[in-house]
Regions:
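Multi-pass alpha-helical transmembrane bundles in non-GPCR membrane proteins
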Residues: 1-238
């Protein structure tokens, strides 16, 4: 079995030194670790290129509010990819436990930031704006919980992540967001990937489980990025 949440928390209370991950049965094989490393390297490269491209395009062609939204989204994107890599690849020690808090917090930031890119358009209605405000409030509470109560609300957090992600259905149903159908399909594809991929997140006995889960998440992020890019592009040309 992998190191549990309680084991990592106990190490965080013992002192600042890092120990061999194998000492507490963090038994990912070398091949599994390399696979996870490769996926995170690809993810970081993708994030840097994607964020850079989005920001350059927004700065050259989009209105001010869209530039702000693109900047917030890029911050969320890079935060998720960076903290995921740092947390998952760091040796088991107190530092890893702290990185775990930021890893979980970054997910809330990215979800709220993603929908910000769709609602800043001047055509967005009151309901859509209220949904966005609600998402940011939930994100703020989630970040506070992840930082102050690490490891105690993990199952609830997963449900909150999924619920926030599928809030796109609300935005689409109220018809108050000028969301192109292609962008909507990309968001649905991303949500479906993460939701279905949760089986890999909890299937700890599966070899390469961690790498497979992170690959699924990366594919979902790519779908959501494509949706954001398409919306920013369409708004820049209107």
């Amino acid at each position: 079995m992998r190191a549990s949440t309680n084991e990592i928390r106990e190490m965080a209370l013992q002192g600042p030194s890092c120990r061999d991950p194998g000492a507490i049965d963090w038994n990912y094989t070398r091949a599994e670790t390399i696979a996870d490393l490769a996926i995170h390297v690809v993810g970081l490269c993708f994030g840097l290129i994607a964020a850079g491209s989005l920001l350059v395009h927004a700065a050259l062609h989009a209105p001010t509010m869209n530039i702000v939204a693109a900047s917030i989204y890029s911050l969320g994107l890079l935060s998720v990819l960076t903290f995921s890599a740092a947390y998952n690849l760091w040796p088991v020690c107190p530092v890893k436990w702290w990185l775990r808090r930021f890893d979980q917090s970054a997910i809330y930031l990215l979800i709220a930031a993603t929908y910000t890119a769709f609602v800043v358009d001047k055509k967005a209605g009151t309901t859509a704006v209220c949904v966005l405000i609600g998402l940011w409030c939930i994100a703020a509470l989630g970040i506070a919980a992840a930082l102050a109560l690490p490891g105690r609300l993990d199952r609830l957090a997963i449900g909150v992540y999924v619920g926030m992600g599928w809030s796109v259905g609300v935005l689409w149903s109220v018809k108050e967001v000028p969301l192109p159908f292609g962008a909507f399909l990309l968001l649905v594809a991303g949500g479906a990937l993460v939701t279905a991929g949760l089986i890999f997140h909890v299937w700890h006995g599966l070899r390469f489980q961690n790498a497979i889960w992170h690959l699924v998440v990366l594919l979902a992020i790519a779908c959501q990025y494509a949706a954001v890019l398409s919306v920013v592009t369409s708004q820049a040309t209107t």
